[in-house]
């Protein structure tokens, strides 16, 4: 039974003296005399959030999008913070006579990872950390790696979009991509729980914003690159460069070893950038690891032959549909091999892997296939729909697009859906602060521009949209609800209401199956 550390922190931290921390990151005392000696207090934790402060913490007061963290310094100190780290703007906002040591750094975020790693005794050096990046497939690949590790008898930790796991147990957490202090604390807690290998998703945001600074990656994996996050990255080139921080020989974040899928141009460029990457391909590219003889396995699964760098053949199987998941599995196998787990050791775990909200089948006894998937960008939607499209069955897709995110992907998603599906139901995703109807219009513009003959319906209410697709489906058809996957809420404006595509689809199926059985 895994015991959960309070606040996902280790239960015991020896602590580091504040003067030593200041020296390590080049911080000085705030105030008129920048050469003043740094008080000799012991720091046992680091946090960005005043409400999370525990006695002995250093509170990092950073500039935010709308407010400066220094506004919350008084609360942090009241809760037991023994020191504050901030910039000049933060110092200017601190009020009253300061008795708590305040360290000044021109770019405090840039040193936060290094500082937190030092406080928690550099936990990634006590673990084998595998980092996986790419536009699509990160979550699935982390789950495949975790399953392979556990099948080989390793005590594994997982950090990703869906959540956190320690030795197979789900750990309640609101963290998705933890900030640097939370990540270092979590890695230290995992080390304390005798985890030996951690597999984690590494987003472009995490790399660009320093959230994984201070982490030593034993192996880095790259899945693919397609359009996404252009609300954050100004160009696709900038997006690529953020991912490349995990592989570039000149990057301080560079993983000790690299595994790269070269089935797209970005992967081939990334392999060249890394210089000594282990390559994988499910598309016939010349690579160290290859998949051949792909065949169906049961309902929705696949089996195939894996050829390793020595030319040895191994049989592998996954309970996940879609050829892109063969590529994800190859990346997982190569990563596992890099940390000493053979394909034979990993195989039983791979076959048992289920990933929440990723091509997740919902079965209520209906006579057609119903799935929920997280695909929320053009490339991912194309990959999923292509894997489901067959001439002997009809395909329906229910999807929308998130508000306050890259608007340039909306029309391409509409065009992709119209090209590959027989029924396209355009609905709301997470509109956030945007007009939901305006988002739907942008998607529908792409549908129109495609010139495809798919049946198209606009239903803003996501629950009603799902029910429409279920009512449309006949024996042997496929219904895909895409975009939200594992998410359990729908955000409109400032309000998030409970909403789970898996729950809604299951309920719609149960309602539909009853009358159909009665008619039969």
Curated annotation (Swiss-Prot):
Organism of origin: Mycolicibacterium paratuberculosis (strain ATCC BAA-968 / K-10) (Mycobacterium paratuberculosis)
Residues reported in the UniProt entry to bind ATP: 134-140
EC number(s) given by UniProt: 6.3.2.13
Protein name: UDP-N-acetylmuramoyl-L-alanyl-D-glutamate--2,6-diaminopimelate ligase
Binding site for meso-2,6-diaminopimelate: 405, 429-432, 483, 487
The keyword Membrane appears for this protein: no
Gene this chain is encoded by: murE
Top-level lineage group: Bacteria
Motif (Meso-diaminopimelate recognition motif): 429-432
Post-translational modification: Carboxylation is probably crucial for Mg(2+) binding and, consequently, for the gamma-phosphate positioning of ATP.
GO cellular component: cytoplasm
Functional description taken from the UniProt entry: Catalyzes the addition of meso-diaminopimelic acid to the nucleotide precursor UDP-N-acetylmuramoyl-L-alanyl-D-glutamate (UMAG) in the biosynthesis of bacterial cell-wall peptidoglycan.
Pfam families: Mur_ligase (PF01225), Mur_ligase_C (PF02875), Mur_ligase_M (PF08245)
